[in-house]
Swiss-Prot record:
Keywords: Hydrolase, Magnesium, Metal-binding, Nucleotide metabolism. The keyword Hydrolase applies. Belongs to the dUTPase family. The keyword Metal-binding applies. This is Deoxyuridine 5'-triphosphate nucleotidohydrolase. One of its GO terms (molecular function) is magnesium ion binding. Its cofactor is Mg(2+). It catalyses: dUTP + H2O = dUMP + diphosphate + H(+). It comes from Haemophilus ducreyi (strain 35000HP / ATCC 700724). InterPro entries: dUTPase, dUTPase-like, dUTPase-like_sf, dUTPase_trimeric. Pfam families: dUTPase. GO terms for biological process: dUMP biosynthetic process; dUTP catabolic process. Substrate binds at residues 71-73, 84, 88-90, 98.
Amino acid sequence: MMKHIDLKILDNRIGREFPLPTYATTGSAGLDLRALIDSAITVEAGQTVLIPTGISVYIADPNLAAVILPRSGLGHKNGIVLGNLVGLIDSDYQGPLMVSIWNRSDKPFTIEVGDRIAQLVFVPVVQASFNIVTDFEQTSRGEGGFGHSGKQ
């Protein structure tokens, strides 16, 4: 299913030097977001920096949101993850998409202009209303918390 989302280009290098965010394959869930910076940035070990992507989106549909997620290779190979772990883009947000990059490794990491730094995934949203109850229907798990469902 293809959903049309309004995208505003904030950096005129997009479409000329760097492509619009696109899906790499027909099975890709995420669109790559790039570092639209003026020059390379070295992120020191333990440091967090905020990187512009050069775009903003307006989802408009309250049944959709977007999440900014880390790229698996950056995290596994280099210790580069999102400073806020997951970025949530609400359907009514219209500002620039920024990526909080955290270097959790013990070595500096350099982000070059145009590097793919994160991915944007659109997800369905269900807004809930609460029924106030005094007891829940019993389940086999009950109140079992972390690790309660076992290892196997």
